[in-house]
């Protein structure tokens, strides 16, 4: 049986289990999709999107609700994630440029990205491009260092050093059976971005949502090209090959009653874009000719049922297909171009059980199976298939002053190839422990600590890519240590919200997978060579000030100090140098003025200098930057519907700073949004 056929039947089997049970459940029904106002209020009180909800977490957990996302002048998930402390988003410029996220200098391959609690996969290079994800139908973005306190989460999330979870909007009906939102954005550099979200209540316990959007931008923004021996000469250029055209379509089905809930989501995304090249004098055109076409599809289902008050089970399933077409029309080879096609498939199944032994003590068991396959039109390509079996056993204790949890993760990996030799299998056991303490009854001051040992597997590119791949690679291992403190309070009507958190951490990485020259500078291979020692501090704070009953001022800030040093070889010239593209200091800020007449929002992202390569010399330095943006918005109520207008000015100071060396970001730009909620 072919691999894609096996994936299809496995996924179909799980859906047959999920859908009939979730829709035609027995028992006393509690209508969570109904419009009863009392029930809606009860849900809002515990909703994680509530503006003043108090968070209790034994690990650093940062969240941005849709209320906050509106204040950050963000178009994509990658724009919003820059406001989390401890995060570096490597951005190659423009809307269509590749954007990956590294947390606390561990690298993008150590960050899992999940959609509604089920992780995305990319066994080819281990990195998820978060620039592909729109904020159009996002409810909450959360980032957990280590892992969050939910011991019922799938084992796959436990297997990552950090997890970025994107939670989409759950349908809510204030009146009638149809609700939705249509919007259109437009702005500088040819941006046009219409979108629509529709939700239909099919039954008292069943709802359907459909969402879609189109995005186009030519991306032709001006920038200053510096040249000369000291960069003392400049010319004004226009960025080339930064156009992007995206199409996204989603459908989701939600069912829920008193003892169970389930959902099914199907997602399609297509992107055609240029890959902007490095801005090199006299050669800007040839370095900006590559094109890439991506098509991503996934279908996933979740089912959860309470068997008895003490026992809950869950099932999750996912099928994911990714296609990439890469074209370099000016490649200096015999064919005069380089063109490759990549097909990646993944099947995923999860089953879990949660047992509440006592009101304060619970245990969980989750087991996940993953099959990943990659095919490419490269000569003698290995066509690898990876089989993973992950099992997590977790426990959690909660009382009025203590939250403590522990997890043991068991990982079994095997690989097969159709050409050449396969990488050997692995078996690992990895621990995690965390706790948060509240020493004072009347003061919401908490101390937290966690330790996690985890690894990331070599990617298919690391193992099998041409002569560079090395099938003898070992997993890249990390140890994470964290001690922190949080404070949250309602101090007065004038100062209804104060939230502060500070964490100090130490991470160590061994067997780091790096490209290393073997015989000479032209012959490279992947090796377990690197060691990194990381020490840092993350701080974040948020304050709400209410000077008048109809006026609210929100202030927020984050700051990161990160000392990430290469400690591989004491005899090398880069020993104890800061690793590439890791600023020693960085941060963000935001301010919002909310009035009945207009809402004004200001946001800031800033970074200290970085180095483009391992050697921390002046010629390798990438300067720091400040990016200021401001917006004004107002909502009009028209016959119980809402018309909203939002105007934004991005990068006010018009600086073409670079996150990645020779890849300048756009200068000042404008964006306008009009939306209609019904």
Task: Place the predicted regions along the sequence by residue.
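Flexible loop and strand-edge segments within Gram-negative outer membrane beta-barrel domains
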Residues: 27, 219-221, 235-249, 256-313, ...
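N-terminal periplasmic "start-of-domain" segments of outer-membrane beta-barrel proteins
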Residues: 30, 40-71
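A beta-strand signature from Gram-negative outer-membrane beta-barrel systems
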Residues: 135-181
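Extracytoplasmic beta-strand/coil segments of soluble accessory domains associated
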Residues: 78-119
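Surface-exposed extracellular loop regions of Gram-negative outer-membrane beta-barrel proteins
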Residues: 414-419, 423-429, 435-482, 504-527, ...
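Gram-negative outer-membrane beta-barrel transporters
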Residues: 363-364, 401-404, 499-508, 527-612
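C-terminal beta-signal and adjacent terminal beta-strands/loops
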Residues: 510-511, 553-555, 606-613, 621, ...
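Membrane-embedded beta-barrel scaffold of Gram-negative outer-membrane proteins
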Residues: 310, 314-326, 447-450, 476-535, ...
């Amino acid at each position: 049986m072919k691999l894609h056929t096996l994936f299809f039947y496995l996924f179909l089997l799980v859906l047959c289990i999920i859908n009939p049970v979730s829709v035609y459940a027995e028992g006393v029904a509690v209508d969570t999709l109904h419009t009863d106002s009392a029930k809606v209020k009860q849900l809002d009180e515990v909703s994680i999107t509530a503006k003043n909800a108090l968070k209790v977490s034994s690990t650093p957990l940062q969240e941005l609700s849709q209320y906050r996302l509106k204040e950050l002048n963000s178009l994509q998930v990658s724009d919003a994630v820059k406001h989390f402390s401890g995060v570096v988003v490597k951005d190659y410029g423009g809307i269509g440029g590749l954007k990956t996220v590294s947390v606390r200098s561990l690298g993008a391959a150590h960050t899992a990205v999940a959609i509604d609690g089920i992780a995305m996969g990319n066994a080819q290079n281990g990195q998820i491009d978060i620039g592909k994800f729109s904020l159009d139908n996002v409810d909450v973005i959360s980032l957990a260092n280590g892992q969050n306190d939910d011991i019922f989460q799938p084992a796959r999330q436990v297997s990552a050093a950090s997890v970025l979870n994107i939670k989409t909007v759950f349908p809510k009906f204030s009146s009638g059976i149809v609700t939705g939102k249509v919007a259109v954005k437009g702005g500088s550099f040819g941006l046009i971005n219409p979108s629509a979200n529709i939700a239909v209540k099919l039954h008292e316990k069943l709802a359907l949502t459909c969402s879609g959007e189109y995005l186009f931008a030519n991306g032709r923004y001006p920038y200053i090209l510096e040249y000369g021996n000291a960069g003392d000469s400049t010319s004004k250029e226009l960025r080339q090959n930064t156009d992007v055209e995206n199409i996204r379509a989603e459908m989701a089905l939600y069912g829920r009653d008193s003892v169970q809930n389930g959902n099914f989501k199907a997602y399609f995304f297509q992107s055609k874009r240029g890959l902007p090249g490095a801005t090199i004098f006299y050669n800007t055109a040839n370095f900006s000719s590559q094109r890439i076409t991506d098509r991503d599809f996934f279908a996933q289902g979740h089912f959860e049922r309470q068997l008895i008050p003490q026992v809950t089970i869950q099932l999750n399933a996912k099928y994911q297909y990714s296609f990439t077409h890469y074209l370099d029309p000016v490649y200096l080879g015999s064919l005069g171009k380089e063109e490759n096609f990549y097909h990646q498939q993944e099947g995923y199944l999860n089953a879990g059980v949660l047992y509440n032994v006592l009101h304060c003590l619970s245990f969980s068991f989750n087991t996940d199976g993953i099959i990943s396959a990659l095919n490419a039109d490269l000569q003698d390509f290995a066509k690898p298939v990876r089989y993973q079996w992950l099992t997590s056993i977790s426990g959690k204790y909660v009382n009025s002053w203590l939250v403590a949890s522990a997890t043991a993760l068991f990982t079994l990996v095997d690989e097969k190839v159709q050409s050449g030799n396969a990488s050997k299998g692995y078996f690992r056991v990895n621990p995690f422990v965390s706790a948060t303490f509240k020493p004072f009854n009347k003061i919401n001051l908490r101390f937290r600590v966690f330790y996690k040992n985890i690894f990331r597997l070599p990617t298919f590119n690391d193992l099998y890519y041409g002569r560079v791949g090395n099938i003898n690679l070992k997993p890249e291992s990390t140890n994470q240590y964290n001690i922190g403190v949080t404070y949250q309070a309602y101090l007065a009507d004038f100062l209804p919200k104060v939230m502060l958190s500070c964490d100090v951490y130490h991470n160590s990485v061994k067997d780091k997978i790096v490209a290393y020259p073997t015989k000479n500078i032209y012959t490279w291979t992947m090796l377990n060579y690197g060691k990194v020692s990381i020490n840092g501090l993350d701080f974040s704070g948020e304050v709400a000030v209410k000077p008048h009953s109809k006026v609210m001022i929100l202030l927020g800030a984050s700051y990161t100090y990160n000392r990430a040093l290469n400690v591989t070889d004491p005899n090398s010239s880069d020993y104890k140098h800061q690793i590439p593209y890791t600023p020693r200091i960085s941060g963000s800020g935001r301010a919002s003025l909310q009035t009945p007449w207009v809402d004004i929002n200001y946001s800031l992202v800033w970074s200290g200098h970085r180095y483009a390569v391992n050697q921390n010399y002046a010629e390798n330095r990438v300067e720091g930057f400040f990016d200021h943006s401001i917006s004004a918005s107002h909502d009009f109520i028209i016959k119980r519907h809402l018309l909203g207008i939002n105007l934004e000015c991005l990068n006010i100071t018009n600086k073409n700073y670079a996150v990645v060396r020779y890849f300048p970001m756009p200068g000042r730009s404008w964006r306008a949004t009009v939306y209609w909620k019904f």
